[in-house]
């Protein structure tokens, strides 16, 4: 439910795949990804890059989390593949590590903040991502750079 009639929020209970992603996300202006697996993140990343839709993505495993704001509407944004090239599901799985439950709420809050900044066209997050360590209460801003060999975005 939204306060304004002009805002439409969609969520999906089905698993995103290469076969259904166009149908699921074609009417989206922004994509907020909080999926729990690397394969889905890669599919969403490729779709958002291809369609030039901003992607706000969050992930957490154990006590640590990350928030990414990929500005694909800009021609100079790195992508998820630039950062995680060569890693697979086993490298980033929470099946064995689990998640510190309150951290998921914190990541969700940061996703909302980043989404609002995108809607308002505020550019404080460009080419950076946040790493959160909830065990030590540290939040670090990291620089994202385009991988010149990235199979998704290097042919801009």
What are these regions (language model features)?
Residues 4-156:
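Adenine nucleotide-associated cytosolic modules
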């Amino acid at each position: 439910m939204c306060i304004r009639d002009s805002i439409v929020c969609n969520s999906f209970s089905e698993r995103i795949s290469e076969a259904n992603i166009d149908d699921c996300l074609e009417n989206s202006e922004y994509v907020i990804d909080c999926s729990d697996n690397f394969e889905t993140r890669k599919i969403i990343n490729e779709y958002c890059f291809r369609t030039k839709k901003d992607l706000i993505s969050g992930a957490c495993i154990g006590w640590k989390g990350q928030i990414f704001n990929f500005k694909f509407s800009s021609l100079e944004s790195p992508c998820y593949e630039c950062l995680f090239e060569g890693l697979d599901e086993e490298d980033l799985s929470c099946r064995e590590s689990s998640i510190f439950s309150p951290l998921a709420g914190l990541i969700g809050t940061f996703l909302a903040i980043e989404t609002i900044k995108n809607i308002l066209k505020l550019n404080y997050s460009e080419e950076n991502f946040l790493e959160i360590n909830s065990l030590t209460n540290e939040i670090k801003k990291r620089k994202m750079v385009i991988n010149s060999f990235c199979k998704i975005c290097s042919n801009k």
